[in-house]
Amino acid sequence: IVYDSEAHACLIDGARMHMGKRMTYRHNDYESCEKTIQRATRLCEETGGGILLITEGVYGMTGALGFLDKIVELKKKYKFRILIDDAHGFGNMGPTGRGTSEHFGVMDEIDLYIGAYAKSMASIGGFVAGPKKIINYLRFNMRSQIYAKSLPMALVEGGLKRLEIIRSKEGDELRQKLFTI
């Protein structure tokens, strides 16, 4: 696992639970990221396995954008998977509010996308989007998912209404207003 040195604590905790090698790169530093990916690639060539790069779309503490467009260039060069935590970008970034990967035009290159309802939707809960095989694995193997209760229907209905707003002309206007503040 390769991740930004200033990734959110939940991402760092998740990475620490992984049994494999973990490597960090300097915060939002393209050259450091590439050097770390090169090291990870050499290690994978020696031992087998693959690389998962974990980053954030918008860093919550600073508001800085992750360099997703450049990370996708590295992905094409070094053949790894990308997980993006876009809790702060979902609903706010991109022409239709689909997040930071939409903002950079790289949505189809993101392998796992994590969004939260707590930020732009002022609610609770979140989601993971990705290939069906991976999502099914998560659904049936994550203890936090297996023993969790579903969201209350009022929150689900409220979330659907908020998604309608995000996708509407009003949502477009609200996103424009957000960036003028």
Can you describe what each PLM-predicted range is?
Residues 23, 27-83:
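Active-site phosphate-binding strand-loop segment of PLP-dependent enzymes
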Residues 124-125, 142-151:
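A short glycine-threonine-serine/GTX helix/turn-capping micro-motif
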Residues 6, 58, 86-88:
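Conserved Walker B
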Residues 1-9, 179:
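Conserved PLP-anchoring active-site segment centered on the Schiff-base-forming lysine
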Residues 102-137:
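Active-site PLP attachment segment
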Residues 66, 157-181:
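Conserved PLP-dependent catalytic core of the aminotransferase class-I/II
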